[in-house]
């Protein structure tokens, strides 16, 4: 990495702090507000300079698409698989379910992302998850009420906010036009929690 100016180092330090405390990079507006820049454009120019010097990678189209590069290693990352249609009873990451692989670093998300899922519809629009977005998912069965989860019912995969009351699961949309999905675990045997949402990549990022 080439040497940084004092201001560039200040921006880089902010990126690292924000990642450590929130699990995601700051937006340009957040950088500007924190460091007293007059506009988000000023933050963008500093980010471009950091990118040219090899300190970060900017992922186009994602408002938080900033990855801090580990300059101790030049290893390339493998990318994240995009999961398509899923057959009931098979692992979600089975080879036949993988439609593509995107060159996205899993460590850009906290906790680390394991796969991407394309979002269909607007049931989660009130939390900024929009039709066509790529949702980054961390595979886990250890989930809490209130988290946004990826759930599978038979061969249907859905993204909703979780609420569990005893043996009843409520999967809540973030759009008042959609009713909750109710699952009785004593009756529905083909139900799985596949993971939690850890980030999104806006739907025009890969055009």
From Swiss-Prot:
Please give the name of this protein.
LexA repressor
Positions bearing the site annotation: Cleavage = 88-89
Q: What is its EC number?
A: 3.4.21.88
HAMAP family associated with the record:
LexA (MF_00015)
Q: Which organism is it from?
A: Haemophilus influenzae (strain PittEE)
Q: What GO terms are given for molecular function?
A: DNA binding; serine-type endopeptidase activity
Q: Which PANTHER family match?
A: LEXA REPRESSOR, LEXA REPRESSOR-RELATED
Q: Which residues bind DNA?
A: 28-48
Quote the catalytic activity from the record.
Hydrolysis of Ala-|-Gly bond in repressor LexA
Belongs to which family? Belongs to the peptidase S24 family.
Q: Which GO terms describe its biological process?
A: DNA repair; DNA replication; negative regulation of DNA-templated transcription; proteolysis; SOS response
Mind listing the UniProt keywords for this protein, alphabetically? Autocatalytic cleavage, DNA damage, DNA repair, DNA replication, DNA-binding, Hydrolase, Repressor, SOS response, Transcription, Transcription regulation
Q: How does it assemble?
A: Homodimer.
Active site, UniProt feature: 123 (for autocatalytic cleavage activity), 160 (for autocatalytic cleavage activity)
Report the function annotation for this chain: Represses a number of genes involved in the response to DNA damage (SOS response), including recA and lexA. In the presence of single-stranded DNA, RecA interacts with LexA causing an autocatalytic cleavage which disrupts the DNA-binding part of LexA, leading to derepression of the SOS regulon and eventually DNA repair.
List the InterPro entries.
LexA, LexA-like, LexA/Signal_pep-like_sf, LexA_DNA-bd_dom, LexA_repressor, Peptidase_S24_LexA, Peptidase_S24_S26A/B/C, WH-like_DNA-bd_sf
Q: Which SUPFAM superfamilies match?
A: LexA/Signal peptidase, Winged helix' DNA-binding domain
- Presence of keyword Repressor: yes
